[in-house]
Amino acid sequence: MELIEQVAVAKKANIYFEGKVASRSVFFSDGSKQTLGVVLPGEYEFSTSQGEIMHVTSGSFEVLLPNSSTWQAFSEGSQFELAANVSFKIRNNAIAEYCCRYL
């Protein structure tokens, strides 16, 4: 298991889509922030306010990236990058987890 050490973690979760997506904010001493999330099976659309890198930490997602008409598969250990101010969709058939690093 990979660990994130010497951080502060928000006690309150960020809850989306009627509880089907939940994440916790993790704050680093250098001022940066990441979120660790769990996604129940379904299809969801998100928007970014800043650039981010999404790391799939367990399970898998299909992702419809901005300006694309083709869903792409991302499994555990893979990642994809998103620009600021874009929308994208994810879907999954089983519980999956991610770590989002903000750029």
Swiss-Prot record:
UniProt EC number: 2.4.2.1, 2.4.2.2
Pfam families: Ppnp
InterPro entries, alphabetized: Ppnp (IPR009664), RmlC-like_jellyroll (IPR014710), RmlC_Cupin_sf (IPR011051)
Keywords, alphabetical: Glycosyltransferase, Transferase
Disulphide bridges, residue numbers: none
Keyword S-adenosyl-L-methionine assigned: no
A molecular function (GO) term: guanosine phosphorylase activity
Gene Ontology cellular component terms for the protein in this record: cytosol
CDD domains assigned: cupin_PpnP-like
Catalytic reaction(s) noted: a purine D-ribonucleoside + phosphate = a purine nucleobase + alpha-D-ribose 1-phosphate; adenosine + phosphate = alpha-D-ribose 1-phosphate + adenine; cytidine + phosphate = cytosine + alpha-D-ribose 1-phosphate; guanosine + phosphate = alpha-D-ribose 1-phosphate + guanine
Recorded family membership: Belongs to the nucleoside phosphorylase PpnP family.
Task of the protein: Catalyzes the phosphorolysis of diverse nucleosides, yielding D-ribose 1-phosphate and the respective free bases. Can use uridine, adenosine, guanosine, cytidine, thymidine, inosine and xanthosine as substrates. Also catalyzes the reverse reactions.
Name of the protein this chain belongs to: Pyrimidine/purine nucleoside phosphorylase
